[in-house]
C-alpha cells in the first residue's frame, strides 16, 4: 500500500525482501561439556550466522541422535541463550542406549522398550516436539519397538520423524515402515 500505516515505528522496506524467519528443521546439536555448557562464546557464533541468513528456529535431535537427554539440552539452551530458537526431537538411539540396548543389530527387550517409552514420554512432557528415529543406523529395530517407542507421541499429540531404513530400490518399503507406524498410532509422520 502507498498509505503509511499508523505505528510507533515505520520501517521503509521498499526494494527489500521481507519474509518470516526460516526454520532449519535438520540440525545436529553439539555435546554438552563437562562444565555443563554447550557452546563457548566463539561457538555461539554459528547461531549468529544462522540468524543473518534468516534462520530463526533450528530443530535438533534428528536421525534418532541426541548428545544427552534432549529435555536437559533444552534447559541448558534456555539458561544460556542463543541467537535463534532451538527445538528438539527425542532421539530414539540415545534413549535406546540409555535403556541398556547397545547392540544396534539386536532387538530391545520388553523392559528396555518400556524404559524408552517412559523416558521419551517425560522428554515430550518437558518440551520435545516428537521422536526421531535413525532406523538405518539401528537395523535391529523392528515394528514392535518402533510402535512402543513412538506410542508416547499419541498421548502427547506429537510427531515422529526418521532417517528411514533404506533408499534406492528399497525406499518405498522403508517409507511405508514409518508411515505404517504413524497409521497404527494415529500420529503425524
Report residues per predicted region:
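Histidine-rich, glycine-flanked metal-binding segment
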Residues: 1-19
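A generic structural signal for short, solvent-exposed coil/turn residues
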Residues: 2-5, 78-80, 152, 183
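A short helix-to-beta-strand connector/capping loop
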Residues: 6, 82-84, 187
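Short Asp/Glu-rich motifs
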Residues: 8, 30, 69-70, 142-143, ...
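Acidic active-site catalytic centers that drive phospho-/nucleotidyl reactions
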Residues: 12, 24, 163
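Divalent-metal coordination cores built from histidine and acidic residues
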Residues: 16-18, 22-132, 153, 157
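Histidine/acidic residue-rich metal-binding segments in metalloenzymes
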Residues: 107-133, 139-189
Amino acid at each position: 500500500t502507498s498509505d503509511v500505516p499508523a505505528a510507533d515505528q515505520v520501517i521503509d522496506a521498499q526494494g527489500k525482501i521481507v519474509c518470516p524467519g526460516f526454520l532449519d528443521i535438520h540440525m545436529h546439536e553439539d555435546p554438552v561439556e563437562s562444565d555443563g555448557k554447550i557452546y563457548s562464546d566463539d561457538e555461539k557464533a554459528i547461531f549468529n550466522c544462522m540468524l543473518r541468513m534468516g534462520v530463526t528456529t533450528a530443530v535438533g535431535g534428528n536421525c534418532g541422535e541426541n548428545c544427552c537427554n534432549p529435555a536437559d539440552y533444552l534447559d541448558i539452551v534456555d539458561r544460556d541463550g542463543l541467537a535463534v530458537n532451538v527445538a528438539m526431537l527425542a532421539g530414539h538411539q540415545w534413549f535406546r542406549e540409555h535403556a541398556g540396548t547397545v547392540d544396534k543389530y539386536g532387538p530391545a527387550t520388553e523392559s528396555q522398550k518400556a524404559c524408552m517409552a517412559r523416558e521419551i514420554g517425560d522428554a515430550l512432557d518437558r518440551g520435545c516436539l516428537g521422536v526421531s528415529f535413525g532406523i538405518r543406523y539401528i537395523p535391529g529395530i523392528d515394528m514392535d519397538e518402533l510402535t512402543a517407542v513412538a506410542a508416547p507421541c499419541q498421548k502427547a499429540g506429537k510427531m515422529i520423524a526418521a532417517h528411514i531404513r533404506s533408499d534406492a530400490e528399497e525406499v518405498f518399503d522403508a517409507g511405508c515402515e514409518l508411515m505404517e507406524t504413524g497409521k497404527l498410532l494415529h500420529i503425524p509422520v
